[in-house]
A protein has these predicted regions:
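Short, well-ordered secondary-structure micro-motifs
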Residues: 18, 45-48, 89-92, 115-117
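Acidic, proline/glycine-rich short linear motifs
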Residues: 36-65, 93
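Structural beta-alpha unit
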Residues: 71-103
Length: 137
């Protein structure tokens, strides 16, 4: 069925829950996973350089958590850190580039005004992508 799953993570508790579901599903299906985290691109000078270093350190932590969960389940795992102003676009592009056949991700479940103002990365991945998406809450 599914052979290669993309697991986007933002380090949130909901994202960690989705990772656990994704790793368990990958183990059951004997599938490979690719973890991805996306941070905005920053300028290489000034205070942006400090922000970028912090974002890079967080990305390493997020991806290491996925690697650790995958290793514990004996699931093959790659991990990539992407930089893009639009996380949904980077997630869709990563899934295509890595030849994934399923995306497993969290939804924060925002409703009403906050959903309209903040938007939803998950909703945009579903709307703009071509792959099936397993949404975890």
């Amino acid at each position: 069925m599914y052979k290669h799953m993309l697991l986007p993570t933002d380090g949130s508790k909901l994202s960690e829950k989705a990772i656990m579901h994704g790793v368990a599903l990958a183990k059951a299906l004997k599938a490979k996973i690719t973890a991805v985290t996306v941070s905005p691109p920053y300028s290489a000078i000034g205070s942006d350089a400090v922000i970028e270093m912090d974002a890079s350190q967080r990305a390493v932590q997020y991806l290491d958590a996925v690697r650790k969960a995958a290793a514990a389940a004996k699931v093959d795992c790659d991990a990539i850190h992407l930089k893009d102003d639009l996380p949904y676009r980077a997630i869709i592009a990563a899934a295509k580039k890595q030849h994934c056949d399923l995306i497993v991700m969290a939804s924060h479940g925002r409703r009403g005004i906050s959903a309209m103002v903040l938007g939803s990365v998950t909703a945009r991945v579903i709307a703009h992508g071509a792959l099936p998406v397993l949404v975890c809450r």
